[in-house]
């Protein structure tokens, strides 16, 4: 893995690949809204670099290559935004109104036309 992560206090214990936003009762919480501009990152699996390593909390990938939970079809190079499915991302569809440009947080590294919830490799921007 090749990501840069930092620990943040979370309001629950989230598994790696979960998309999180700033908010909730602690510093971060699971995303549940499409194109949420509060996106913080993705819960990291094994960060290459971990900031605030002595702090409690979950490692949130801020940059680099990580597995990300997604729903819907994605193509290599697609921009990813938060989805309405809690903790998951989806591909940004260019023709769809999506709110803030600040809601884009990653790019897909794979072509995957599955529609079931799953993990894919992506680069956090």
Label for each model-derived stretch:
Residues 1-125:
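Extracellular receptor-binding modules and their adjoining Ser/Thr/Gly/Asp/Asn-rich linkers
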């Amino acid at each position: 893995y090749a990501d840069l992560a930092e620990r943040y206090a979370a309001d629950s214990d989230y598994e790696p690949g979960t998309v999180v936003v700033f908010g909730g009762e602690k510093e971060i919480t699971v995303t549940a809204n499409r194109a949420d501009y509060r996106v913080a990152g993705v819960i990291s699996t094994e960060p290459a670099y971990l900031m605030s390593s002595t702090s409690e909390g979950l490692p949130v990938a801020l940059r680099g290559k990580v597995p990300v939970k997604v729903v819907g079809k994605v193509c290599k190079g697609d921009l990813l935004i938060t989805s309405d499915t809690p903790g998951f991302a989806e591909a940004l569809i260019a023709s769809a109104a999506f709110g803030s440009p600040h809601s884009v947080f990653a790019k897909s590294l794979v072509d995957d036309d599955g529609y079931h919830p799953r993990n894919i490799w992506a680069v956090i921007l």
